[in-house]
Amino acid sequence: MVPELQKSTVRIQQPERVMGVIRAIKEQGCSKLQVISDFDMTLSRFGCNGRRCPTSHNILDNSHVISEDGKKKLKDLLHHYYPIEIDPNRTLEEKRPLMVEWWTRAHELLSQQKIQKGDIAQIVRESDVMLRDGFNELFDQLHKYSVPMFIFSAGVGDVLEEIIRQANVFYPNVNVVSNYMDFDDSGVLKCFKSPLIHTYNKNNSVLQGTAYFQQLSTRTSIILLGDSMGDLTMADGVPSVENILKIGFLNDKVEEQRGRYLDAYDIVLESDETLDVVNGILRYILMET
């Protein structure tokens, strides 16, 4: 059915159930399908040539528009909060307020840097960001079959949209909900628009998605792509779900997180920098039989 599922990076706890879901989504047809995806480290690569690839926040943090002092403070925040974000021994309840604190402090620091709206394209061009191998096929196929793609990101929307734009895949079927910058009349960043989206509130509490999902109420088959426990709630705004396939990229601390990911995601991709498996499943689902 889907030869890509034989890749060595693939782990599936319940293969029969997963194949059943994939078959059911195919039977429902592409008019019933929508894709809901995280962006950073899901559509973009986690690592390349042994180095970490940047997230949409990192792209700003590391860019020429941030002062040395600003860079140091942002790095300090990362070193303090990132271990908390991925700590398997803390509950989501413990993590949530700390993530709000991190994002708020980072956005306040960025807002002091006088970032110009016109600089963002250049900042993205100069960065090391890479989309996962196979991104062209993913975006092209979804566009060709008019399958809506909802990108739900705790990153920076302005940066993320620019990455997709520069990759020439920002098609009309792609919708983004993320943290967007608010510029003053002269195009200088003054703050970020609310609501704040962090790793662990990607759910109904962020209301921008709900109107979107209402319009797509007939699309009851969902493929969800994520890389964190916080991404599992991204489809919570969908009014009725008949079939959902959750695919998780396990990028970091693979050994210690494997058990939790296998329990939470239908398919887990370990240290896999490609979209091969996603594309293989879509090829099977979208193939006219």
Swiss-Prot record:
CDD domains: HAD_5NT (cd07504). Its EC number is 3.1.3.91, 3.1.3.5. GO terms for molecular function: hydrolase activity; magnesium ion binding; nucleotide binding. The keyword Metal-binding applies. Signal peptide: none annotated. Its main location: cytoplasm. GO terms for biological process: nucleotide metabolic process. Disulfide bonds: none annotated. Substrate binds at S153, A154, K202. The active site is at D38, D40. It is an enzyme of class 3 (hydrolase). Keywords: Cytoplasm, Hydrolase, Magnesium, Metal-binding, Nucleotide metabolism, Nucleotide-binding. CMP binds at E85. Pfam families: UMPH-1. Mg(2+) binds at D38, D40, D227. N(7)-methyl-GMP binds at E85. GO terms for cellular component: cytoplasm. Belongs to the pyrimidine 5'-nucleotidase family. Specifically hydrolyzes 7-methylguanosine monophosphate (m(7)GMP) to 7-methylguanosine and inorganic phosphate. The specific activity for m(7)GMP may protect cells against undesired salvage of m(7)GMP and its incorporation into nucleic acids. Also has weak activity for CMP. UMP and purine nucleotides are poor substrates. Monomer. This is 7-methylguanosine phosphate-specific 5'-nucleotidase. It comes from Gallus gallus.
